[in-house]
Amino acid sequence: MMFSRFFKAVPARAPAFSSPLPVYQARTMATVRNQRPVERATFTIRDGPIFHGKSFGARTTISGEAVFTTSLVGYPESLTDPSYRGQILVFTQPLIGNYGVPSTERDRHGLLKYFESPNLQAAGVVVADVAEQYSHWTAVQSLGEWCAREGVPAISGVDTRAIVTYLREQGSSLARITVGEEYDADQDEAFTDPEQIHLVRQVSTKAPFHVSAADPQCHVAVLDCGVKENILRSLVSRGASITVFPFDYPIHKVAHHFDGVFISNGPGDPTHCQDTTYHLRRLMETSQVPIFGICLGHQLLALAAGARTVKLKYGNRAHNIPALDLTTGRCHITSQNHGYAVDASTLPSDWKPYFVNLNDSSNEGMIHKSRPIFSTQFHPEAKGGPLDSSYLFDIYIDSVKKYKNSQLAFHPSRETIPSPLLVDLLPKERVDVAPTIGMQNVAAAAAAAAAATA
């Protein structure tokens, strides 16, 4: 009887928010800070609750869209994923940072082994508890040291269960991390909305670069909307040398030099990339080249085909989301990170849904009925996450090789293998991609860029 009364007294979920601006005090942290002085920090959701905690990152104030991930591991990969540009990432896993942050070591292809881009991409980090004492053979620094070095504020000691409950019920919201200051309700102008910023322009390479395969068997053009390193690795490791272009490059004008076209993941609203969708539409009208898109690339391909996209209430960000392959009836556990989705009901008649999300029934992929063109909303390259759907890269590369052989049958002199001159002249990594230095600075940079092109 005593135990039954006890369990009845414990709520099964975070409490509802009865007032518009409740204040939640920081809880006692489980990790030891070795008596280091800790500075106060505040996480404020616009028109929502305020959470007081402790700063463990850069001493700066930022704002952006607050989103959450339920991934248990893979925080170095998540935080360097360009798709998180402009977002304050809330981790539901209670303890973050216990295996530290790895080095910037590169593999034999010149790609980063442990990160998905050279810089920390999230605008801010929110955790319940941060581990300052880390242990892993690849670790070279703590999560706090990394955030401070990258200029990204981070807050710990807050009730992430309450934060996630609010975001699930109210939807992804604008929020702010303030370090060493009290919340001022009159400072709503400080909330920067990343949806109003062309974030893809911030993360895309500014000039083409090339990555060679050890044994090149085909040549793929990649549109960089914020491409992850493991996507490039997934292509190169399968024998595809790749040339990576800026997101708005007129790919339809050079597609005849390539055996396939790939459209990468990236941040923000897909409707901002109107030049990209136009170029993809022209590509599908003028070429039979195989095309594969992932995440934002899936959405851009859908827009180019004539479909529409919608913004989800709070998005899907996790490493364990089930997606059903509608062609085989098999379920795959997938890694996802997106706030928009394709409206499958708007797909043209020559397209059909490929995958569907078994949690919320949202579209997870589409495939052309007669051509080698398909795309997925989830990330088959994982990193982090399961590799259930990595076979999709094999399907794509097989179609690329088949296309190459068919073209050689009609045009024996056709050559798509990159020349040594091209390989020597082009850079081997992203060109002029600025790091995240706080969303207010990103917004200022975007405004300056818009003024310069006006």
Curated annotation (Swiss-Prot):
Family from the record: Belongs to the CarA family.
Residue ranges constituting the Glutamine amidotransferase type-1 domain according to the UniProt record: 219-406
Underlying gene: cpa-1
Subcellular location: Mitochondrion matrix
Protein's UniProt name: Carbamoyl phosphate synthase arginine-specific small chain
GO biological process terms, semicolon-separated: 'de novo' pyrimidine nucleobase biosynthetic process; glutamine metabolic process; L-arginine biosynthetic process; pyrimidine nucleotide biosynthetic process
GO cellular component, one term: mitochondrial matrix
GO function term, MF aspect, one: carbamoyl-phosphate synthase (glutamine-hydrolyzing) activity
Function comment: Small subunit of the arginine-specific carbamoyl phosphate synthase (CPSase). CPSase catalyzes the formation of carbamoyl phosphate from the ammonia moiety of glutamine, carbonate, and phosphate donated by ATP, the first step of the arginine biosynthetic pathway. The small subunit (glutamine amidotransferase) binds and cleaves glutamine to supply the large subunit with the substrate ammonia.
Pfam families per UniProt: CPSase_sm_chain (PF00988), GATase (PF00117)
This protein's record includes keyword Transcription regulation: no
